[in-house]
Amino acid sequence: MIETDKFSAPDRVISATPASSREEAFERALRPKLLDEYVGQEKVRGQLDIFMHAARNRREALDHVLLFGPPGLGKTTLAHIIAREMGVNLRQTSGPVLERPGDLAALLTNLEANDVLFIDEIHRLSPVVEEILYPALEDYQIDIMIGEGPAARSVKLDLQPFTLVGATTRAGMLTNPLRDRFGIVARLEFYTAEELARIVTRSAQLLGAHIDPLGSLEIARRARGTPRIANRLLRRVRDYAEVKGDGTITREIADAALAMLDVDRVGFDLMDRKLLEAVLHKFGGGPVGVDNLAAAIGEERDTIEDVLEPYLIQQGYLQRTPRGRVATAAAYRHFGLASPQAGDSGDLIDGE
């Protein structure tokens, strides 16, 4: 059984990014170990199952894999599953950590045959490190410089065959040469409420929590299509159920706990409402540029683009147009406001 501290929620309970190393440890404990245990992403799972099966039959390293999509959808989990299904070791790092070519060279030269190297935030690799990676991906070789000044010389080192699994939330920031070296490219999509309910039920069992189907579904509906958020909400609702109820998570208990956390029925929290209200009230529904919007709500541009916007756009509350962000009719309805006339909104989204 996995224990959690009472009411130790992160500042933004529906953030899709891990709040601390301790939360990452909880995630690892709840993480499915095999592809058959992995819920959702049916298309990606089906593709990986075939590609891994073929690579195992040929006793080869799996082709290099690029996983992209919003945070919290299971990219790291899939990297661990790939290594386990292939029966090999996994080495994990991230783009910002690999500051010098020697950092990457040390990782690559220590890989055993067919091992998996997982690089999270791969779009943040420095250009000089990325250059070292190209021959490693294509030919399983790296060039390193020995010595300094006029006496320096390049030495080519052979590597064991390996699989690079790269993960990113910003696929558009990858350079074309790097993107082209991945043989398998998969986009992870937001999960349905039914898929998330299955994940919540499974996680509750691992946590030793009692939950009924309607309780699972209530949490799932407010989890913004993201397993990481669903598991975080589950832990907070479990705390509430133990203190305010008999420990069983019902729909009513889940609703009360999530209301306490200020997560509404469509999964919006204060930050989501702040963003939408800024578009509606400060900028007349839009269009508004992302930099102006970031200044208006006191957030970083990257936070808006990577964390806040994807769910709002996917759910149809916000549009991204060439002229800026525009609130949709659904956003007006959510706040009980009258929508603008069709002619006015048509001018705003001209060119879409």
From Swiss-Prot:
Q: What is known of its domains?
A: Has 3 domains, the large (RuvB-L) and small ATPase (RuvB-S) domains and the C-terminal head (RuvB-H) domain. The head domain binds DNA, while the ATPase domains jointly bind ATP, ADP or are empty depending on the state of the subunit in the translocation cycle. During a single DNA translocation step the structure of each domain remains the same, but their relative positions change.
A single cellular component GO annotation: cytoplasm
Q: What is this protein called?
A: Holliday junction branch migration complex subunit RuvB
Instruction: Tell me the residue numbers annotated for binding Mg(2+).
Output: 76
The segments labelled Head domain (RuvB-H) in the record are 265-352
List the EC numbers from the record: 3.6.4.-
Positions bound to ATP: 30-31, 72, 75-77, 138-140, 181, 191, 228
- Gene3D superfamilies given in the database record: 1.10.8.60, P-loop containing nucleotide triphosphate hydrolases, Winged helix-like DNA-binding domain superfamily/Winged helix DNA-binding domain
Source organism per entry reads: Cupriavidus pinatubonensis (strain JMP 134 / LMG 1197)
Q: Which GO terms describe its molecular function?
A: ATP binding; ATP hydrolysis activity; four-way junction DNA binding; four-way junction helicase activity
Instruction: Report the SUPFAM superfamilies cross-referenced here.
Output: P-loop containing nucleoside triphosphate hydrolases (SSF52540), Winged helix' DNA-binding domain (SSF46785)
List the subcellular locations.
Answer: Cytoplasm
